[in-house]
Each structure stands twice: as C-alpha cells, then as structure tokens.
C-alpha cells in the first residue's frame, strides 16, 4: 500500500517489498496506489517498466474489476 506517499517514497517502499516477495516465492503482489490524479500510478508504472527491462519482474498490469480497478497494479514476479 503506497497511498499517500510521494513517488520517491513509493519506489523505495516497492523496491524492498518486491525483493521480500521474491524471497518468499510469491507469484504476484498487488500494489495499492489509489486512483486520484494518476501521478502515483504513473510513477509506479515507470518504476515497474524499469524493473521489467532489468528482468527483476515478469510483468505488471492494471487491476481488473473486483481487484481494485485502476487503483491497483498487479505485479507478476
């Protein structure tokens, strides 16, 4: 949950959370960033795009109906 954080705070939080999730052999995680103005979502997606290029994650997608819609991002590890 990165609600209320700046993009820099969210990226720092996500970096550790993704590492911990990989160590725990989780298949995916859900990042709650909220809908708001979309700035936090955009920052999270830019960071995840970098991680995908570095092959640290397999991919990511917007949440679907019932998952949180555009207020969450699902990260496939």
What are these regions (language model features)?
Residues 1-77:
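Long, charged, low-complexity intrinsically disordered regions
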């Amino acid at each position: 949950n990165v609600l209320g954080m700046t993009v820099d705070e969210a990226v720092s939080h996500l970096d550790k959370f993704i590492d911990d999730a990989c160590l725990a052999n989780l298949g995916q995680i859900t990042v709650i960033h909220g809908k708001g103005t979309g700035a936090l979502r955009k920052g999270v997606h830019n960071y995840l795009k970098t991680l995908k290029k570095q092959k640290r994650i397999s991919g990511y997608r917007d949440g679907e109906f019932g998952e949180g819609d555009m207020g969450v991002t699902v990260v496939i590890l």
